[in-house]
Amino acid sequence: MRPGNRTPAQTRPISITRNFTAHAEGSVLVEFGETKVLCTASFTEGVPRFLKGSGQGWLTAEYGMLPRSTHSRMDREAARGKQSGRTQEIQRLIGRALRAAVDLKQLGENTIVVDCDVIQADGGTRTAAITGACVALVDALNWARGKGLVKANPLKFLIAAVSVGIHNGEAICDLEYVEDSAAETDMNVVMTETGKIIEVQGTAEGEPFTHEELLTMLELAKHGIREIIDTQKAALN
């Protein structure tokens, strides 16, 4: 039996709170069960040097975990003087996923910086971050349109993400830490609101998985993401 008596296809309770902070153009507290991530989207004029004169905008992301977001305290990466490989991998994933949802030409020569800070971690922090950041991004883009900084809406579609995996021989959706840490397979899936795949990250950490198991996990992800996007839409409305 899964924690909380969840079925294999069931996500944790998901909550999205908009306008969580006062200063960012878009800010969201996203909660996947006990995983809580603060996501902000900041609109800034100008683009990186490689895009100057192109008429195209840019979106980039940063990710971090508070020292006591985990069971035992960890040092801040700033105190260590460098980011871990895991942090760099996750923030690149968040940036790639969100860029897929935006028409950068419609953004003009402006940049959106997304910051995802994990307040409390219980598995699935990167998928929660992508999900919350998408809503913060929508609010930042609406702010920019309201200010006349962009004309047409650069957002192409909503995106969301969820973890899936195989635990005790069974494919399950939205793994919390006790499941994730013991899973034979761990996978993260990012999809659009129409069910198209943006990214799949999957690793057999214990036993290799079959083609059939892969399809089962993707189907679980599609079902879970559909529900998560419904939650995004409800928050935005």
Curated annotation (Swiss-Prot):
Please report the name of this protein according to its UniProt entry: Ribonuclease PH
Q: Which NCBIfam families match?
A: RNasePH
Q: What does this protein do?
A: Phosphorolytic 3'-5' exoribonuclease that plays an important role in tRNA 3'-end maturation. Removes nucleotide residues following the 3'-CCA terminus of tRNAs; can also add nucleotides to the ends of RNA molecules by using nucleoside diphosphates as substrates, but this may not be physiologically important. Probably plays a role in initiation of 16S rRNA degradation (leading to ribosome degradation) during starvation.
Q: Which GO terms describe its molecular function?
A: 3'-5'-RNA exonuclease activity; tRNA binding; tRNA nucleotidyltransferase activity
Where does the record locate the signal sequence feature? none
As recorded in UniProt, its EC number(s) are 2.7.7.56
Alphabetical list of Gene3D superfamilies matching this protein: GHMP Kinase, N-terminal domain (3.30.230.70)
Q: Which family does it belong to?
A: Belongs to the RNase PH family.
Enzymatic reactions: tRNA(n+1) + phosphate = tRNA(n) + a ribonucleoside 5'-diphosphate
SUPFAM superfamilies xrefs: Ribonuclease PH domain 2-like (SSF55666), Ribosomal protein S5 domain 2-like (SSF54211)
